[in-house]
Amino acid sequence: MLLLPLLLLAVIVPGGDNEDVFQGPTSFHVIQISTFANSTWAQNQGSGWLDNLQLYGWDSDPGTTIFLKPWSKGNFSDEEVTELEELFRVYLIGFTLEVQDHVSEFQLEYPFVIQDIAGCELHPGKAVESFLKGAFGGLDFVSIKNDSCAPVPEGGSMAQRFYELIIQYHAICDTIAKLLLETCPRYFLSVLDAGKAELQRQVKPEAWLSSGPTPGPGRLLLVCHVSGFYPKPVWVMWMRGEQEEPGTQQGDIMPNANWTWHLRATLDVAAGEAAGLSCRVKHSSLGDQDIVLYWGHPTSTGLIFVAIIVSSLILLICLALWFWRRWSYLTIL
């Protein structure tokens, strides 16, 4: 455990340059979704994530991990990965049986779903904090933070009974503690290092403007779309000159399938006030060259489309003239 701060420093500050701030994922977590249809049928699904970037999935039939990136194992050996797979496989079998044995005691009614999320996250002070949360029907019932375990008050009596049940299994509690406090931070930091080239890449955003559904009579909804950028932090704002428009509404930053991000920023304005507005995009990949798109001006996509149409027409005219001249020449002969 004493090596973790040194590993963290090596990952966050490559080459010892304090100005090279890592802008990649700040958490790793595993999600478990267990569906119980009846007393004889249950299905367990699992996946591992760096923030919103999926690293692997769990194939429940053979009980093996499906790695989605070449560096998804971090610096863990094949033997360590196999050992963790076996541990997770045994855990899921025991978890399923244990839940089915206590359905009546906990007054559960089929079908139901239990969700767990466990992992570790990096805080601004460069400390790694581990966590585990369990939920039934979308309501949390148990929470573990570092080495502290407690029922969630919102979970009521069921949360208390589950907590009292789980703490009886000392071996399970010790295994969970080791996974959360030792294995998770070590894996998290190693996978950040193994995937550094991809996680620290810079991908420039693309931006375009459109109008959204009419908010009301005499009004316009201006939409600024920004997509394909990485890393995640981005600044998008509607502007009038150098002044920010306070009515700008920025949506959530959502992931694309190719590990980039997208979002949109909207502005509700009177139709007569749209002239002179622009959308400004700031992103680390752009340096000091912000993207600025002016409302009412042709976008680059529109210009490209027009250029293609014009070029195609010119080509067709040239071909027609060539065929006409050739036909005229052959007719004379």
Curated annotation (Swiss-Prot):
CDD domains: IgC1_CD1. Disulfide bonds join 120-184, 224-279. Glycans are attached at residues 38, 75, 146, 258. Keywords: Adaptive immunity, Cell membrane, Disulfide bond, Endosome, Glycoprotein, Immunity, Immunoglobulin domain, Lysosome, Membrane, Signal, Transmembrane, Transmembrane helix. A motif (Internalization signal) lies at residues 329-332. SMART domains: IGc1 (SM00407). It holds the Pfam family MHC_I_3. Residues 324-333 are cytoplasmic. PANTHER family: MHC CLASS I-RELATED (PTHR16675), T-CELL SURFACE GLYCOPROTEIN CD1B (PTHR16675:SF130). Residues 185-295 form the Ig-like domain. One of its GO terms (cellular component) is external side of plasma membrane. One of its GO terms (molecular function) is lipopeptide binding. One of its GO terms (biological process) is adaptive immune response. Its main location: membrane. Residues 1-18 form the signal peptide. This is T-cell surface glycoprotein CD1b-1. InterPro entries: Ig-like_dom, Ig-like_dom_sf, Ig-like_fold, Ig_C1-set, MHC_class-I_related, MHC_I-like_Ag-recog, MHC_I-like_Ag-recog_sf, MHC_I/II-like_Ag-recog. During protein synthesis and maturation, CD1 family members bind endogenous lipids that are replaced by lipid or glycolipid antigens when the proteins are internalized and pass through endosomes or lysosomes, before trafficking back to the cell surface. Interaction with saposin C is required for the loading of bacterial lipid antigens onto CD1B in the lysosome. The chain crosses the membrane at residues 303-323. Residues 19-302 are extracellular. Antigen-presenting protein that binds self and non-self lipid and glycolipid antigens and presents them to T-cell receptors on natural killer T-cells. It is found in: Cell membrane; Endosome membrane; Lysosome membrane. Heterodimer with B2M (beta-2-microglobulin). Interacts with saposin C. It is a single-pass type I membrane protein.
